[in-house]
UniProtKB/Swiss-Prot annotation:
Effector protein of a CBASS antivirus system. CBASS (cyclic oligonucleotide-based antiphage signaling system) provides immunity against bacteriophage. The CD-NTase protein (CdnE) synthesizes cyclic nucleotides in response to infection; these serve as specific second messenger signals. The signals activate a diverse range of effectors, leading to bacterial cell death and thus abortive phage infection. This system triggers membrane disruption without lysis. A type I-B CBASS system. The C-terminus forms a minimal, eight-stranded beta barrel that probably oligomerizes. Belongs to the CBASS Cap15 membrane effector family. It is found in: Cell membrane. It is a multi-pass membrane protein. The chain crosses the membrane at residues 11-31, 33-53. Keywords: Antiviral defense, Cell membrane, Membrane, Nucleotide-binding, Transmembrane, Transmembrane helix. InterPro entries: Cap15 (IPR041208). Disruption phenotype: Loss of protection against phage in S.aureus strain RN4200. This is CD-NTase-associated protein 15. Pfam families: Cap15_CD_rec. One of its GO terms (molecular function) is nucleotide binding.
Length: 182
């Protein structure tokens, strides 16, 4: 996360310098702007551009040369293979929402919904890995069989799929494979 914050600070610095210089050039050539106005406009424009960059501009091809952050946002169909007493396979849907600094994951099945508590994509041995901790919220009819639980997932980020493993505090483990929907 610190690398991402440092990157965002550098991008903000560059935006600020560029807009400041552009406004000085405009002030000297086109229309007279006072120093206080130049500083005010620079801060305002840089703030909005930084917010836009953090929310969505970092995904644009133009800005991809400045960062290597994987864009995994979207809807996925997933196969969950679980091992706990009995084992089985379950089809689930996953929605990933992402900004430059945050990742939020929601997994839905016929029995539960789980939401990420913390999540981050890190580089591990040259690969992007999504780690996230989650809490489950079972439907009332499944609460005794599948109570509220906390767990962690480690997924290797591929082009259009994520694959990996999860484990929980109830000693449940399993494999998870997500395929991005178009």
């Amino acid at each position: 996360m610190n690398d991402k914050i440092n990157h965002l600070i550098k991008i903000t610095g560059w935006f600020t310098v560029i807009f400041f210089l552009l406004l000085i050039i405009v002030s000297c050539t086109v229309w007279q702007i006072g120093w206080i106005d130049i500083i005010s406009y620079t801060v305002t424009i840089s703030t909005f551009i930084t917010i836009g960059y953090e929310r969505f501009m970092w995904k644009w091809k133009l800005f991809r040369i400045f960062n290597k952050q994987a864009d995994i946002s979207g809807d996925y169909e997933a196969t969950l293979r679980y091992f706990y007493g009995e084992s089985g396979i379950k089809k689930v849907s996953v929605e990933i929402k992402q900004t430059f600094l945050t990742v939020n994951i929601e997994l839905r099945s016929d029995e539960i919904t789980s939401n990420s508590i913390t999540a981050d994509i890190i580089e591990e041995h040259g690969k992007n890995i999504l780690y996230y901790t989650y809490i489950t919220n079972p439907k009332a009819e499944f609460e005794k069989k599948n109570p509220i639980n906390r767990g962690t997932t480690r997924l290797i980020v591929g082009e259009n799929e994520l694959t990996g493993k999860y484990w929980t505090g109830a000693e449940t483990t399993g494999d998870l494979r997500l395929k991005k929907l178009k």
